Amino acid sequence: ANEPKDELRINFCIDPIIKSLSVKGTCGCKENERNCFDVIAELVKATAEYKRVKVVNVSGATFSNAGSTIVEELAFTLSAAHEYLVKLMEKGLTIDEVARKIRFTFAVTANYFLEMAKFRAARMLWANIVKAYNPSKDCSMKMVAHAVTSTWNQTVYDPYVNMLRGTTEAMSAAIAGVHSLEVLPFDYSFEAATEFSKRIARNSQLLLKHESHFDQVVDPAGGSYYVEVLTVSIAEQAWKLFNEVEDNGGFLAQLEAGEIQKAVNASGVKRHTDVARRKEILLGTNQYPNFTETALEKIDKAGCCCCCSEGEEGGVEALKFDRAGSEFEDLRLATERSGK
């Protein structure tokens, strides 16, 4: 209660467009949709004096964890965020009031340099979108980005490799300049996190902060020719896809038509094929697997966090969630069950 208004930090993490509609498939009732935006608009007004309080959290990680490409994740996330801008301004709010209450969550994968470039491109494109509405303050064009390590490339077999993936992903996000970061425990995909796995996840971030000092350098990747070229390339491709979505009625229209899901699910199928053909490498799964390892006994169904999607009757089609190594793991688990 005594916290200064400029210092109070709260994230409501409300996201009826992506999190509720893409994961649960509940976009069947227009009345519910209107009520959601009415509630969000009231929260934006109520927290207007609290600069660091965020109301909307645009969950772009949802697309990445369903197997989308980096370009699709960025374009669809920005399109959903634009939908929030439009819907909330229709409620009488200004661009400055709305934009400053939006936070983004992106997944960060093991594509080290591409992930750095993705966050840099995201900030550039979001600034362009907000600028088009003539905000009165430049700070309204600033993107607040949260990163969470990927679930797509986590594996059940050789799970300690997940520690390496998480560290690499955390490093990409830190160098890219995210505002906050979540490193998932290495056993996230097959059991409820243990004290050990949670401690390792926390310490990965602390090492990057206290030993590598990534929090003390502004844009360490800035000026790198390779990263700058990647940034421009990703920005151009994402902007093109963003405009295609907008030209066809916007994110909600494309979601209800099933076009967003179709694109993301197709990318997921292609990536599974790439893993099967070893064009996309998963160490310990399709490259250098330990065939003496067994995993059946360590899978805790109650604690499993596989991001299984579900659709609801009358709603839109939900995204299909899976992990890159799931098909390999299914074969090995079936072999274990057979006792051979």
Name each model feature, range by range:
Residues 1-109, 133, 142-146, 174, ...:
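Catalytic alpha/beta active-site cores
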Residues 17-22, 62-68, 91, 95, ...:
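Flexible loop/turn segments at secondary-structure boundaries
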Residues 43-44, 48-87, 167-242:
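Mobile "lid/hinge" segments at catalytic clefts and subdomain interfaces of large enzymes
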Residues 68-74, 109-121, 150-163, 191-201, ...:
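Short glycine/threonine-rich loop-to-helix capping motif typified by GTGT followed
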Residues 179, 240-340:
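Intrinsic disorder at enzyme termini
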